């Protein structure tokens, strides 16, 4: 399933629904030429490309109509035409046929992930998935994963100073997270040991969110058995896991260099520079990708439909992936110029998300 944003962008009263076959054919050729070359295309070339015999003058008349509908425009540097963002959205929604992946492409993604199926961490597997996805699409690949969905294995307190300790949290997939914890005054080594034992008896196999709920309940029920300082250490440990929602999200970006390929002008280089700046805005990228967690299937944002990348004129194609229980635990996809090969990239993102879901499901 493919979701387009924003829903309802193509209004039925715009006249687009009444485009005849000739107009659609000419518009399709303009878009496909742009996606292939990034260059404006003129009426003479269009008249050679379309299936029906039309003179360049007749093609120009149709192009004028398409321009009035807001589907194409004339850049100031050329007599040819390019699709507008609105035109690209119409093409993706109404005219484009999404193809199937070739067997070679499927095998390429499967093989890359199979090679890391026994990797030390899910993060390593996702990194490999992104490397393959960016290589196949020639765009930047991104993944947003929730650390809080990792299942816990072990916790340990290591005293650093009289009133500071390092909390070492080890996950079942091998990930290790360290946080510095401020200790209540006068905590003895025995209280740290007792707190570790109490926590380890209750967190194994649970996600961070599940562990928090379990421990808050268990702490209330076990107050009579624990001395006051140990209770404070446990409470401080739980609180340290709740700090900062951005820490619960992990963003990985691969394939920046792909965006530097096939640049046609200084204007293209400036767009890529702006996109690089956007990708460094971690909070914005996380917010964008987080939108895909609320729906199944592939979502497509073209140009200014996504405020984060509006200046760089970039498109984003993203899809959620699930864990073994069928819960959405992250989002992956690609970010690139608006002239992405949508028909090819959409099934790649969809397939990669499904393979990652299968891998996480065991």
From Swiss-Prot:
- Keywords associated with the record: Repressor, Stress response, Transcription, Transcription regulation
Q: Which family does it belong to?
A: Belongs to the HrcA family.
Species: Nitrobacter hamburgensis (strain DSM 10229 / NCIMB 13809 / X14)
- State the HAMAP family in the record: HrcA
Q: What is this protein called in UniProt?
A: Heat-inducible transcription repressor HrcA
Q: Which Gene3D superfamilies match?
A: 3.30.450.40, Heat-inducible transcription repressor hrca homolog, domain 3 (3.30.390.60), Winged helix-like DNA-binding domain superfamily/Winged helix DNA-binding domain (1.10.10.10)
One BP term from GO = negative regulation of DNA-templated transcription
Keyword flag Repressor: yes
Pfam families given in the database record: HrcA
Presence of keyword Transcription regulation: yes
A Gene Ontology molecular function term for this protein is: DNA binding
Main role?
Negative regulator of class I heat shock genes (grpE-dnaK-dnaJ and groELS operons). Prevents heat-shock induction of these operons.
At the top level, the lineage of the source is Bacteria
């Amino acid at each position: 399933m493919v979701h387009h944003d924003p829903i309802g962008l193509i209004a039925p009263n715009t006249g687009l629904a009444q485009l005849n076959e000739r107009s659609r054919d000419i518009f399709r050729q303009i878009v496909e030429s742009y996606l292939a070359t990034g260059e404006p295309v003129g009426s003479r070339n269009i008249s050679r490309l379309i299936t029906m015999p039309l003179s360049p003058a007749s093609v120009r008349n149709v192009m004028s109509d398409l321009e009035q509908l807001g589907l194409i425009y004339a850049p100031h540097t050329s007599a040819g035409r390019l699709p507008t963002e609105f035109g690209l959205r119409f093409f993706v929604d109404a005219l484009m046929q999404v193809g199937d992946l070739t067997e070679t492409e499927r095998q390429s993604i499967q093989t890359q992930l199979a090679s890391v199926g026994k990797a030390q961490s899910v993060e390593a597997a996702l990194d490999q998935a992104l490397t393959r996805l960016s290589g196949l699409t020639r765009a930047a690949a991104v993944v947003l994963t929730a650390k809080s969905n990792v299942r816990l294995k072990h916790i340990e307190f290591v005293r650093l100073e009289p009133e500071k300790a390092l909390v070492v949290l080890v996950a079942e997939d091998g990930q290790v997270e360290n946080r510095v914890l401020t200790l209540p005054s006068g905590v003895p080594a025995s209280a740290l040991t007792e707190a570790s034992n109490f926590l380890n008896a209750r967190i194994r196999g649970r996600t961070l969110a599940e562990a928090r709920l379990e421990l808050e309940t268990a702490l209330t029920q076990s107050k009579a058995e624990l001395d006051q300082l140990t209770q404070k250490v446990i409470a401080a440990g739980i609180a340290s896991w709740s700090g900062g929602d951005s820490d619960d999200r992990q963003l990985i970006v691969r394939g920046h260099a792909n965006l530097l390929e096939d640049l046609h002008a200084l204007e293209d280089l400036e767009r890529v520079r702006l996109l690089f700046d956007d990708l460094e805005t971690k909070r914005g990228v996380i917010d964008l990708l987080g939108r895909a967690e609320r729906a199944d299937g592939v979502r497509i944002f073209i140009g200014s439909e996504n405020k984060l990348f509006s200046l760089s004129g970039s498109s984003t194609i993203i899809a959620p992936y699930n864990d073994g229980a069928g819960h959405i635990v992250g989002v992956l996809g690609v970010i690139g110029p608006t002239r992405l090969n949508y028909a090819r990239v959409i099934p790649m993102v969809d397939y990669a998300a499904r393979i990652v879901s299968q891998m996480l499901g065991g």
